[in-house]
Amino acid sequence: MFGGWRLVVWQIFSEIITRRLGFWICLYFAALSVGMISGSEPLVRTRHIQNTHTVPINRSPGSLRAWQAGSTYVFGRQGGVITYSWPPHDRPSTRVDRLALGFSTLMEDATLVRVDSSAGLGDYLKLHIVKGNVVAVFNVGTYDINIEEKAKLVNDGNYHIVRFTRSGGNATLQVDDLPVIERFPPGHIDSHRLGTGRLPYRRLVEESLPKNGRQLTIFNSQMTIRIGGWQKQQVSGFQGQMSGFYYNGLKVFSMAADGDPNVRMEGSVRLVGELQSSSTPHGGATVYQSSVTEISSTTSNTITITYSTPADEQQTTDELLVASAECPSDDEDIDPCEPSSGTLCCFVPPAGPTGPAISSFPGPAEVFRESNGTTGMVVGIVAGAALCILILLYAMYKYRNRDEGSYHVDESRNYICNSNGAALKEKNTADDDSGSKSKKNKNKEYYV
């Protein structure tokens, strides 16, 4: 017996209780785990294009807002220039350069941007318009290398996006949604390599072409970025609108709008702001907003940037995002690494103005409602589980007390009945003995 119960009954009942308690306990902890997981998820989820062996690029909700319009500047008829200057002890030397910007103009010849190295080195990168065509030219110590897009004129007053990439002596150029143009100069054996976009600060001067005929690749000690091309001695500066400027991680227009001390503006340059009007100088060019940017980086060093531009919004963006690739060594100072199978094509053409709209990320109200719903669900599950456990314990307590009481009452009654029966039996036996003795004595006296 165990607590007034038979041992077999107790074992069966305890097994049932254990199963039920285990089920509710598991349900309770599962609810807690669901609540913790839901609470730890980021409030903003980013979209990525999935390719083979993709490497995700995490984006902070506060810093990379690619769906918002960027700063736009208007360069007047008198010409103007926006200049960014690196600090003297922080001038980068790069093997890979990436440049992207959007503009609208009616000029047939104009300089869009020029990047120069420190005095005496002679390295430079220039993007300009020649007879209505976009031309990129650079020199990293060997000779001038040109790459030009002749299939489309850009001096029509419409908004155009230009993307340029340099990897050593190789280069790519893309205007709007046209095919990417690639340029591989002779004498360069590393036609498929992409290096790290920034090297530690040091004075890397490439004096002459090596004897083996290799193309020099380092853009040494970059000093200034001049946007607009205007100079006081010249009057043929850029005239029109320009937005979304990006160069090796620098968003110069946003920095200028924020009052960065390294950015200086001269001439006829003014900030339009976040919301750009549909009318532009010299004939009303239309500027579309790049509403979302999606990035994926593969192991073959292919970086994709996709734009969706709805026609009903007249905004621009300077959130053109890129990523560096492999092989951090310097061609001129360190043994070359193994060539990879990557390509130089780094961008996907933007979608047309009739592309589907991309839904924005959830606002604070939606996030707050979702958080409240999750909290309420967890609290409800926990409260229900606790109530079920209390009811089960109360039922066990009542059932146990009822069984023990009936058992003790029955036992006491059986004991009393047995004792009374024994006493009665003894009394009857004694009476029979005394009666027989008296009868015998009486008979004996009678006969005597």
From Swiss-Prot:
Compositional bias segments (type: Basic and acidic residues): 426-436
UniProt record, GO biological process: cell adhesion
Single GO cellular component term: membrane
Primary localization class, coarse: membrane
Ranges annotated as spanning the membrane: 376-396
Family indicated by similarity: Belongs to the neurexin family.
Function in brief: Neuronal cell surface protein that may be involved in cell recognition and cell adhesion. May play a role in formation or maintenance of synaptic junctions.
Protein name: Neurexin-1b-beta
Gene assigned in the entry: nrxn1b
